[in-house]
Amino acid sequence: MEKNKALDAALAQIERAFGKGSIMRMGSRSESEAIDVISTGSLGLDLALGIGGLPRGRVIEIYGPESSGKTTLALHAVAEAQKRGGTCAFVDAEHALDPIYARKLGVDVDNLLISQPDTGEQALEIADTLVRSGAIDVLVVDSVAALVPRAELEGEMGDSHVGLHARLMSQALRKLTGSISRSKTLVIFLNQIRLKIGVMFGNPETTTGGNALKFYASIRMDIRRIGSIKDREEVTGNQTRVKVVKNKLAPPFRQVEFDIMYGEGISKVGELLDLGVKAGIVEKSGAWFSCDSQRIGQGRENAKQFLRDNPDVAASIEQRIRAQANLVEAAMITDETETEAAD
């Protein structure tokens, strides 16, 4: 009894000093309230993440080689948040955002907040101010590699600045994490990859900005271009693979493949075909695709066109895929083990 009284007194003192809700019993948080998520714009990736999308109030890292689809994926998440009436911001440290392409992906560029900062410190201060406002739903930083510390910009070209970038990221994330959680802002950091020198065994690839982002990120996704999509001789898009390499909210290491079409973004009908085959909803016999004994096309591109022309069939397939989400997720884990064996 005395211990309980002492604990109650301590809790009351903490709440007086730091405000109500600063400490509580874990079970009292409305039955561990459901995670609020924002769709990635890819049905397959939403399923691979295990929670239906990207979680609000968390840090996300998307990394990969050049032209792999990092910015495209981030812009799809922005478009999905805007569809729900959310406010989004884009910190364009690379000074390379194309508003015409963003509009084609469904982004409302007229209401998208954009900043093109001069230094890494300025970019992260802007990000911190926006997050603390509590009015931003999605914040994208493109990219970590372009967050150049002020000292490096003001120095000479050959000067050595060992660890400066990593220290900047570490300090910023220590400062940002608490306000990101409180404001329920989804913060997406895009990152590039580099090769570590002298690595004889294991993967020589690493991301820029030190290790801080790896620790603070709740989800890390590795995005790669694995092939080209051609219409006769013309390349019209990329085949893309995304692997969830870290996930604090669901089992990690699931992967999904989808098409990114030039000028269109993620091909939703292509995903419906692939996921439909995995779930047994769409049957594939040779080059023919069929659904409920109805042939929908010979060859993947013809089947995709059929789904574009028949949105009711596409909606029916999507509904059934969502109803069999567990089956599709299990297939993603199987695909992962098969890919590793092939590698």
UniProtKB/Swiss-Prot annotation:
GO terms for biological process: DNA recombination; DNA repair; SOS response. Its main location: cytoplasm. ATP binds at residues 64-71. The keyword Lipid metabolism does not apply. CDD domains: RecA (cd00983). Can catalyze the hydrolysis of ATP in the presence of single-stranded DNA, the ATP-dependent uptake of single-stranded DNA by duplex DNA, and the ATP-dependent hybridization of homologous single-stranded DNAs. It interacts with LexA causing its activation and leading to its autocatalytic cleavage. This is Protein RecA. It comes from Acidiphilium cryptum (strain JF-5). The lineage of its organism: Bacteria, Pseudomonadati, Pseudomonadota, Alphaproteobacteria, Acetobacterales.
